[in-house]
A protein has these predicted regions:
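Extended, hydrophobic alpha-helical segments in both membrane/secreted and soluble proteins
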Residues: 118, 277-284, 288-334, 340-373, ...
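Amphipathic, small/basic residue-rich leader segments at the start of a protein or domain
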Residues: 1-101, 121, 560, 564-585
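Internal helix-loop-helix
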Residues: 56-128, 177-180, 312, 316-319, ...
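Glycine-rich beta->alpha junctions and the first turn(s) of the following alpha-helix
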Residues: 216-313, 389-485
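A short core secondary-structure module
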Residues: 163-215
Length: 585
């Protein structure tokens, strides 16, 4: 997959070069992707959605190489290791990456909250047990299909002095891994007066009752993954409740509700899924700079490829930054609230930026000539676009991610942290030019100032412009923040690369190349921020008037941002010339 310098640069960008275990995981996943996944794609494995022997062979290869047991084999956090495996597999096919991840998604809540007995039984991968996480879409009691989809539990049998038996009724939709799952972690809600609240409960095929793996789901992408609509009507002991339960006045009360159990799981996996999607962008660019890659024809617009490359690097940087922070959080026994909130925000922002960028950029790339993979498959970019659109729905659609980001970005602690980030970057910008740092900090200050103004603006009735009900205001500001966070993460990664370039003996051109890419990413982010801030601040002027003082302050900030764009177009041209020269090698 790599040009001679590509891996070294990116391992250092993402802070994994010094971790032999992480590099080994990435190389293992790459080997499986090339030797097990790619041949199946060439043979037409994406042509059908049913679970076949050929797809089972891919799963067996993932098992044999330890890629389905990463969760139980690392002591330094699991998000970065899973992210690297997903990156390499999604480079070839998103469905293969889903095969690797879905079991971990189900097991994470057991790892975080399970009893010792549950961990011993369900996290021991010596016999390669596979798991599935069965939620409604997305959680019990939520969504337009809540009545049809949500699951429930009640006491089925309760002999005094013995453990209660629970009756579980659950219907799932679009559930991965069900064709071969050895157990299922299902979200259910209590619906009688003998049980209280919601929980996650572990189900096994041998339990009394109906364990129906469900009908096959017809999908436009991720065909290598198993996906069905399962049905469960089972009796299980109450000890299967993840995290155990308490007896209060004769009522079964789970120790944790399903939202608490899934919170760290979703935090990690939003970062991981963002990296799966970002991988698709760079997999389109990389063949153009690999002299041995098989590309044909001349791309119609090199500048568009520059935009795609910069977006892919920024998406990957934000995703890996969120994964590292998630690992740091997991390794702390009592993490601060500030760190927890920041990790949740970055994970949601990473997923939103990756999915929203990938679908647009890959749609443009589909019109280019010359961007074919090493196997020459004509459906290469089309398949990646379809997979990216499906990934945009995992763990909640883009609207949900925007809602999470817009709610978190007005937190006082985060806004203080955001100001600190801006000041830190300004100090770097005084030392280094040509990276677009000044441009990025101007955009960050404009966004922060505009957010404050929007939150203060009211109409004649005292109604605030910035409120949950007015998503036409909150969502564009959330999108703008995600672009800024992605550009910031990429800038910090490039600064890290500059620190170690001499020590790692990286090619001299990589610094200037990634400086230019960082400048392009910052320019793109600042342009979208300036447009969104102007539209939101003045676009509601008829009902939310803006004072002359506010207009002057905004004009001053935007003028500084415009001047800071100096050199960004030249950086874009230099990258385009580099791509053209590499393509002609």
């Amino acid at each position: 997959m790599a040009a001679s310098w590509w891996d070294d640069v990116h391992w250092n960008l993402w802070r994994v070069a010094d971790r032999a275990d992480l590099v080994a995981t990435a190389h293992t996943a790459r080997r499986v992707a090339r030797e097990a996944v790619a041949p199946q794609l060439v043979a037409g494995a994406r042509s059908g959605c049913e679970w076949t022997a050929e797809k089972a062979n891919i799963l067996a290869s993932l098992d044999a190489n330890g890629l389905t047991s990463i969760l139980s084999s690392t002591d330094h956090g699991i998000a970065t290791a899973l992210s690297l495996a997903a990156w390499e597999l999604a480079w070839i096919d998103g469905g293969a990456a889903t095969l690797c991840l879905s079991g971990s998604l189900a097991q994470m809540s057991i790892l975080d909250f399970g009893t010792k007995e549950q961990k011993d039984r369900y996290l021991d991968n010596s016999d390669r047990r596979h798991a599935a996480l069965c939620l409604t879409e997305p959680i019990p009691g939520a969504g337009s299909d809540a009545t049809f989809l949500s699951g429930g539990f009640q006491t089925a049998e309760w002999v005094p002095g013995s453990e209660p038996m629970l009756e579980i009724r659950k219907r799932g939709r679009f559930i991965s891994h069900m064709d071969f799952a050895d157990f299922v972690v299902a979200a259910v809600q209590g619906y009688t007066d003998r049980v209280r609240g919601s929980c996650l409960v572990i189900l096994e095929p041998g339990d009394a009752g109906e364990f129906n793996r469900g009908s096959r789901v017809r999908k436009i992408g991720h065909q290598l993954a198993s996906t069905t609509n399962p049905i469960f009507d089972l009796r299980v002991p109450a000890s299967r409740i993840v995290g155990d339960y308490r007896m209060i006045d004769g009522v079964v009360v789970p120790n944790y509700d399903h939202r608490r159990l899934l919170e760290p799981t979703f935090r990690r996996n939003r970062a991981i899924l963002s990296i799966m999607t970002a991988s698709k962008l760079l997999s389109v660019v990389q063949p153009l700079i690999n002299p041995t890659g098989q590309t044909t024809g001349e791309p119609e617009c090199w500048e568009q490829m520059v935009e795609l490359w910069a977006a892919g690097e920024a998406a990957a940087s934000l995703g890996f930054s969120a994964a590292r922070l998630s690992d740091e959080l997991d390794c702390r026994k009592d993490p601060a609230r500030k760190l927890t909130s920041q990790s949740a925000l970055l994970s949601s922002a990473a997923k939103l930026f990756s999915t929203s960028s990938a679908t647009v950029m890959l749609r443009h790339a589909a019109a280019f000539e010359g961007c074919w993979p090493i196997d020459g498959s004509a459906g290469f970019i089309r398949d990646k676009l379809l997979d990216a659109q499906i990934e945009a729905l995992y763990l909640g659609p883009e609207a949900l991610q925007r809602r999470l980001v817009s709610a978190a970005m007005i937190d006082g602690e985060f806004l203080e942290t955001f100001q600190t980030w801006t000041e830190d970057l300004e100090r770097h910008g005084q030392r280094l030019s040509g990276m677009g740092i000044h441009n990025l900090t101007c955009a960050m200050r404009l966004w922060h100032w505009t957010l404050g103004q929007l939150r203060q603006q009211t109409d004649s009735r005292g109604t605030r412009l910035f409120c949950d009900a007015r998503q036409g205001v909150t969502f564009p500001m959330a999108d703008s923040l995600c672009r800024l966070l992605a550009a910031r993460s990429f800038t910090l990664d490039v600064l890290e690369l500059e620190k170690i370039r001499n020590r790692e003996a990286l090619p001299t051109f990589t610094s200037s190349l990634f400086f230019d890419l960082s400048a392009v990413a910052s320019a793109n982010a600042s342009g979208s921020v300036a447009r969104a801030c102007a539209e939101l601040l003045f676009g509601y002027g008829e009902h939310f008037p803006v004072s002359a003082t506010t207009r002057n302050a905004f004009d001053h900030l935007r003028a500084k941002l415009k001047l800071s764009l100096c050199g960004s177009a030249a950086a874009r041209n230099r990258i385009a010339q580099f791509l053209r020269a590499e393509h002609q090698c």
